[in-house]
UniProtKB/Swiss-Prot annotation:
Protein source organism: Blochmanniella pennsylvanica (strain BPEN)
Reaction catalyzed: (2R)-2-phosphoglycerate = phosphoenolpyruvate + H2O
Top-level taxon: Bacteria
CDD domains to which the protein is assigned, alphabetical: enolase
Pfam families referenced in this protein's UniProt entry, alphabetically: Enolase_C, Enolase_N
Residues forming the catalytic site: 209 (proton donor), 343 (proton acceptor)
GO molecular function per UniProt: magnesium ion binding; phosphopyruvate hydratase activity
Residues involved in Mg(2+) binding: 246, 291, 318
Listed name of the protein: Enolase
Length: 432
C-alpha cells in the first residue's frame, strides 16, 4: 500500500499577488504538490475560501489559518492512508470539516490536499495525472478528448479597471484541428488585437486574467475590435473563430428592482430584455456561448433565457451552479441552462468535482473546466479536462505564465496521447 508519509502545507502567492495555499504530499520515492486559485467575482453558493482577515498582513488576505489546518488536523488524519484512495481521503477531510460549505478548514485547504494526493497517486502508479483522473472518473478507456479552449481576449467587470460590464469576451478557435493549432490561433489574434488597440490610441492595459482591459463606449465596440483582430490575423469569423462571453450577471443584477444595470451603456434591463440584448449581440457577432447570462438570484430569468436561447446557444451556469451537484440537479429539474462551468475551488475537492462533471454529462449538459482570475502555476485543470473528456477548457489568453502553464500542459498531453486523443468539435445551431 502506497502510504502517505507526510503532508506539508504552506502559504504561496497567486497571480494577483495574494496568498494562497500550496500542499505537498510525500510518499515513498518522492512528493507532489498542488496549489489552489481564487476568484474575484465569487458566487454566493461557493465553498468558503478561508482567509485570515488580519488587516496587518496582506490586507487580511493571508491564509495561515488554512495552512494550519493542513499541517494540523488534516495531516494527523491522513498520515498512513493509502494515497490511491481519493474518495476515502476526500471524505475524511470533508467529514472532519463538518460544515456544508467547508467553512471550518476552508475549501482552499481541503482542495490543495485533494489535488496533491491525486498527483502523488499518479506518480505511484507511474501514469500521467490525466490518466489517473480518467481512472478515478471511470472514463471509457479507448480515447480521451482534448478540450477546445475558450480564450479570454478582453476583460471587463470585476476582472478589470475599466467601464465594460460584461466580464469576459472570448474567442473559440473552432477551425483548429489540434490544441497546438488552437493556441497558435489564439496567440495571433491576441497579438493583432494589441496592435489594433495601440494604433487607435486605446489602452493596452491588462485585466486580472490577462486579457486587454480598455475603456470602450459599448460592448458592441469590444466585439467589433475582436472581429477586426480576427480578420487581421487571416481568420474568418464563424468559420475559423466564434465568440463567447461571460456576463457574470450576478454582479449586474439589482435585487431591489430585479433589473440588470449596464452602466457602460446607461441602460437597465429586465430579465427578458437582457436576454434579447444578448441575443442580438450573439446574432451579429457569432457568439455561440453565454456564461451567467442571468443572475444566480434570478432562476426565473435563467429559465426564460434557456427557453428562448437554449436550443441554439451554449448557456453556461457558473455562479448559478457553483460546481455543486445539488444546485446542478435543481437546474436539470427546471431545464435551466444547458452547460456548467467547473471550478474545483467552488466545491473544494477533486472527488466532488468529478461527481459534478459526471452528473452534468449524464444529463446532457456541456462541461467546461475553468481557471480563476487569481491563478497559480498549477496545471491540474488541464489534466482534469482531458481525464474527464470534458470537451472545453477556459484558462485565459495565451499570455501570463499562470495561464500559459495550462496551455503548455495541454500541448504535452496531446503529444503523449497521439492518436488516442480526439480534439473536441464544437457543435452549435448558430454556426449552421
Amino acid at each position: 500500500m502506497p502510504k502517505i508519509l507526510n503532508i506539508v502545507g504552506r502559504e504561496v502567492i497567486d497571480s494577483r499577488g495574494n496568498p494562497t495555499v500550496e500542499t505537498e504530499v510525500y510518499i515513498k520515492g518522492g512528493s507532489r504538490l498542488a496549489s489552489v486559485p481564487s476568484g474575484a467575482s465569487v458566487g454566493s453558493q461557493e465553498a468558503l475560501e478561508l482567509r485570515d482577515n488580519n488587516n496587518n498582513r496582506f490586507f487580511g488576505k493571508g491564509v495561515t489559518k488554512a495552512v494550519s489546518f493542513v499541517n494540523g488536523p488534516i495531516h494527523k488524519a491522513l498520515i498512513g492512508m493509502d494515497v490511491t484512495q481519493q474518495r476515502v481521503i476526500d471524505t475524511i477531510m470533508i467529514d472532519l470539516d463538518g460544515t456544508s460549505n467547508k467553512s471550518k478548514f476552508g475549501a482552499n485547504a481541503i482542495l490543495s490536499v485533494s489535488l496533491a494526493v491525486a498527483k502523488a497517486a499518479s506518480a505511484f502508479k507511474n501514469v500521467p495525472l490525466y490518466q489517473h483522473i480518467s481512472d478515478l472518473y471511470d472514463a471509457p478507456k479507448n480515447t480521451l478528448v482534448m478540450p477546445l479552449p475558450m480564450m479570454n481576449i478582453i476583460n471587463g467587470g470585476k476582472h478589470a479597471d475599466n467601464n465594460l460590464d460584461i466580464q469576459e469576451f472570448m474567442i473559440i478557435p473552432i477551425g483548429a484541428k489540434t490544441i497546438k493549432e488552437a493556441i497558435q490561433m489564439g496567440s495571433e489574434i491576441s497579438y493583432n488585437l494589441r496592435v489594433i488597440l495601440s494604433n487607435k490610441g486605446i489602452s493596452t492595459q491588462l485585466g486580472d486574467e490577462g486579457g486587454y482591459a480598455p475603456n470602450l463606449n459599448s460592448h458592441a465596440t469590444a466585439l467589433e475590435l475582436i472581429k477586426e483582430s480576427i480578420e487581421q490575423s487571416g481568420y474568418i469569423l464563424k468559420e475559423d473563430i466564434v465568440l463567447a462571453i461571460d456576463c457574470a450577471a450576478s454582479e449586474l443584477f439589482d435585487t431591489s428592482t430585479n433589473k440588470y444595470n449596464i452602466k457602460s451603456e446607461k441602460k437597465f434591463f429586465t430579465s427578458e430584455e437582457f436576454t434579447y440584448y444578448l441575443s442580438s449581440l450573439a446574432q451579429k457577432y457569432s457568439i455561440v456561448s453565454i456564461e451567467d447570462g442571468q443572475s444566480e438570484y434570478d432562476w426565473d430569468g435563467f429559465a426564460y433565457q434557456t427557453k428562448v436561447l437554449g436550443n441554439k446557444i451554449q448557456l453556461i451556469g457558473d455562479d448559478l451552479f457553483a460546481t455543486n451537484i445539488n444546485l446542478l440537479q435543481m437546474g436539470i429539474n427546471r431545464n435551466i441552462a444547458n452547460s456548467i462551468l467547473i471550478k474545483c475551488n467552488q466545491i473544494g475537492s477533486l472527488t466532488e468535482t468529478l461527481e459534478t462533471i459526471k452528473m452534468a454529462k449524464n444529463a446532457g449538459y456541456g462541461t467546461i473546466i475553468s481557471h480563476r482570475s487569481g491563478e497559480t502555476e498549477d496545471t491540474s485543470i488541464a489534466d482534469i479536462a482531458v481525464g474527464t473528456s470534458a470537451g472545453q477548457i477556459k484558462t485565459g489568453p495565451v499570455r501570463c505564465s499562470e495561464r500559459v502553464a495550462k496551455y503548455n500542459q495541454l500541448i504535452r498531453i496531446e503529444e503523449m496521447l497521439g492518436k488516442k486523443g480526439v480534439f473536441y468539435r464544437f457543435k452549435n445551431k448558430l454556426m449552421s
